[in-house]
């Protein structure tokens, strides 16, 4: 836009500082190209954070079940809410569990985790299946040890995946010492085995 200024009896045309429409469109095009190039990486990072959040939540609930079993001196069970499908959610409960459950016991549910979509548990991994009953779950006895319903020790893994990024996974591993770890097989395959 031109502005007129007068110096004495003469008029000078001066332009104001600013950007033309063409320059503005070029900048918007550059921003759009950069956003298009970085979007897949951003979606991958969001999916990785979602998987990590669910993994940490599951481990926190397992730690809670173990600590309550020790504190209250009774068994606690962490199990899927729907017929052996961890992806539908899980429940932490106490009472009426194990071989020594009596008729007067009252079951108490401490935590219930709902559906975790778009995260899902992959079928590879043992998924804490009791070899005798075929049921999934982790039973913590009064001393805090993870056992099966028949008394066998549990050292196992669960594998988490994401619906939108199929090649992304995290493994939650319960070691023989009762310690949990989360590993990414894409970056530390040696630690995952």
Which residue stretches match the model-derived regions?
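Alpha-helical hydrophobic helix detector
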Residues: 25-41
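N-terminal helix-rich module
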Residues: 2-11, 37, 43-57, 67, ...
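Generic recognition of well-ordered alpha-helical segments
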Residues: 60-64
């Amino acid at each position: 836009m031109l502005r007129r200024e007068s110096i004495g009896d003469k008029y000078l045309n001066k332009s104001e500082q600013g950007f033309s429409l063409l320059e503005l469109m070029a900048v918007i095009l550059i921003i759009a190209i950069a956003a298009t190039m970085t979007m897949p990486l951003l979606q991958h990072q969001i999916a990785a954070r979602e998987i990590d959040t669910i993994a940490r939540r599951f481990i926190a609930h397992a730690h809670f079940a173990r600590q309550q079993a020790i504190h209250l001196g009774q068994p606690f069970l962490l199990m899927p809410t729907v017929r052996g499908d961890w992806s539908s959610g899980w429940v932490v409960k106490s009472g009426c569990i194990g071989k020594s459950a009596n008729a007067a016991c009252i079951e108490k549910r401490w935590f219930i985790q709902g559906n975790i979509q778009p995260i899902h548990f992959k079928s590879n991994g043992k998924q804490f299946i009791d070899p005798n009953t075929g049921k999934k779950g982790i039973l913590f006895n009064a001393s805090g040890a993870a056992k099966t319903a028949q008394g066998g020790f549990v050292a196992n893994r669960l594998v988490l995946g994401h619906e939108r990024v199929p090649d992304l996974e995290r493994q939650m591993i319960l070691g023989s010492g009762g310690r949990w770890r989360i590993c990414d097989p894409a970056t530390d395959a040696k630690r995952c085995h």
